[in-house]
Structures are given as structure tokens and as C-alpha cells.
Amino acid sequence: VDASEWTYTTGQIKEAFFKTEGKVQRALILAGTRVDGRQPDELRALNSEVDILPRTHGSAIFQRGETQALVTATLGTPRDMPIIDGLCDEYKKPFFMHYNFPPFSTGEIKPLRGPSRRDIGHGELAEKSLRAVMPATDQFPYTVRLVADLMESNGSTSQAATTGGSLALMAAGVPI
């Protein structure tokens, strides 16, 4: 069929898709299953391992279903603290986290051009969560850098980065 013979508008196609999607979701709910085949009360499989990278201070891999994060912890001296120059006065940051969500983790082929808004936002979310359990600098006078590399993604990537981060911190000997 030649595309010029189609009589449906883009709006009509979107509306039909939306209605079909609603019917499928309703059928799944009534059948008591999720899109991936799990029952409503069934959790995704969990797996974790620490110290998988021998040359880092701490490392962990955390997997929940088809989402996997490889997180490394590196310890430095107080002189290694990055100086943050924002809208207010400069300050030093004893704990910081980088979150990398490369295209291959979702099966996409895109160029890597630095962190995206998503990378920055999810990294801030995970960093804020973990900062709450970090020891005070007078008790633990080190700079701590976490790097979370998402290896696979099927949802809950910031949760995987946060959980993997806590495991990597413990593997590095950080008293959280």
C-alpha cells in the first residue's frame, strides 16, 4: 500500500494507539499480571556483589531485574575536594557522585557528548540520598567520589545507582 493512499491523520493514529494501550493495560490488570509477566506482588530479581574491581577502594555491582549499575568508590585527601563555584559563595564538597547513563544501556546507538540533563538530575538525586548517611568530615576526613555506570536499564536506574553506591561505600570502608 502506498503511503499516499492512507486516509488517517496523525491525530487519529495517536488516539487509536492510546485507546488500544488502555485496553491492553486494563486486560493485564484484570488478569493480575504485569507487562513483563510478573504478578502484582512479585518483585524483580535482586543480585549484588562487592569488590569486583580489584584496584578501586570500593566497588559494587547491583542488579534489579534488567537494570544493572556498576559503582566505584574512590577516597582522597581533603585537598582533593572539588571547589564548587555556583551562584552563592564557593564551597568545597567532601562527597560527590557522578551518574553515567550511556546509550548502550538501553540498546541505543548515540554519540557520547558529556552528561545529559537526566544524568545530572539522577546523579543529584542519588548523591542527596547517600549524603544523608555519610559521616561528618571531622569523623571521616576524606574526599569520597562515587561513579555509577549504568550497564543495563529497564527502570529504577537511580535506585540501582543509590543501592550500588551504598554497597561501594561500605566496600571502601566508609562508616555509613
Please state what every model-predicted region is:
Residues 111-116, 148-156:
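A short glycine/serine-rich beta->alpha loop
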